[in-house]
């Protein structure tokens, strides 16, 4: 988003229709990483920059994989990652931006890296391709998780790949009787395990089954 400074005032201009956006304010340490044609700008608080390189590689590989699969996102090739406090969400995606809570910078965890892959996918499914209504939320959530799932599929083989696919199936069926994909956003807390298993895992499974039926192309 272009920024102009006049008389000490910052003016942010968005040439495309969209929500106003979000701001993160703090005494950040800025570090920029390059992955192919993508520029990742990390803004972290002092003491939290030890995982920047690892997270940057995870995010950069995700961007490259999704670009090969889906083309470039409308949000451009610059991606800003900002650290926020622990009183908000663990992750929050905006056009060309990702907000990450401070607790995620304490140590590198596999679940955090998996989540980063999914959050990057929202630059395509939710930001580039919008939703017609709130009832379509499962499409964005499911496609983002499926995109991350397909990326992780390329990193394992043999028995590990079988276990990986079986885990997705088990998660998608765990709360089978709780709510449908369409009703989950209105009936369940989006931070609950049930919501995440249904919207993420079952949503991803729908697209995996579609791929298995029609083929990758």
Language-model-derived ranges and their functions:
Residues 1-26:
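Extended, low-hydrophobicity, Ser/Thr/Pro/Gly-biased non-transmembrane segments
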Residues 11, 28-123, 127-137, 147, ...:
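Juxtacatalytic substrate-recognition/specificity segment
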Residues 1-5, 211-217:
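Short, intrinsically disordered, charge-balanced linker/junction segments flanking boundaries
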Residues 72-79, 132-133, 155-164, 217:
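Acidic/polar loop patches that form or flank catalytic/metal-binding clefts of enzymes
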Residues 90-91, 137, 141-205, 209-214:
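Acidic/His/Gly-enriched intrinsically disordered linker/tail segments
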Residues 14-19, 65, 143-150:
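Alpha-helical scaffold segments in carbohydrate-active enzymes
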């Amino acid at each position: 988003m272009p920024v102009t400074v006049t008389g000490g005032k910052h003016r942010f201009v968005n040439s495309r229709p969209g929500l106003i956006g979000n701001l993160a304010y703090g005494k950040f340490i800025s570090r920029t990483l390059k992955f192919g044609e993508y520029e990742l700008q990390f803004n972290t608080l002092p003491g939290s920059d030890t995982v920047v390189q690892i997270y940057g590689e995870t995010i950069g590989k995700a961007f490259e994989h999704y670009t090969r699969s889906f083309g470039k996102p409308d949000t451009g090739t610059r991606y800003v990652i900002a650290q926020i406090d622990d009183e908000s969400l663990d992750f929050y995606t905006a056009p060309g931006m990702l907000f990450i809570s401070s607790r995620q910078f304490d140590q590198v965890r596999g679940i955090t890296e998996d989540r980063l892959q999914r959050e990057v996918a929202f630059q395509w499914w939710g930001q580039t391709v919008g939703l017609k209504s709130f009832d379509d939320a499962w499409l964005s959530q499911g496609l983002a998780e499926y995109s991350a799932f397909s990326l992780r599929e390329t990193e394992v083989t043999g028995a590990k790949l079988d276990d990986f696919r079986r885990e997705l199936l088990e998660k998608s069926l765990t709360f089978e009787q709780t709510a449908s994909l369409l009703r989950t956003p209105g009936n369940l807390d989006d931070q609950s395990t049930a919501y995440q298993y249904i919207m993420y895992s079952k949503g991803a499974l729908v697209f995996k089954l579609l791929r298995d039926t029609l083929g990758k192309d």
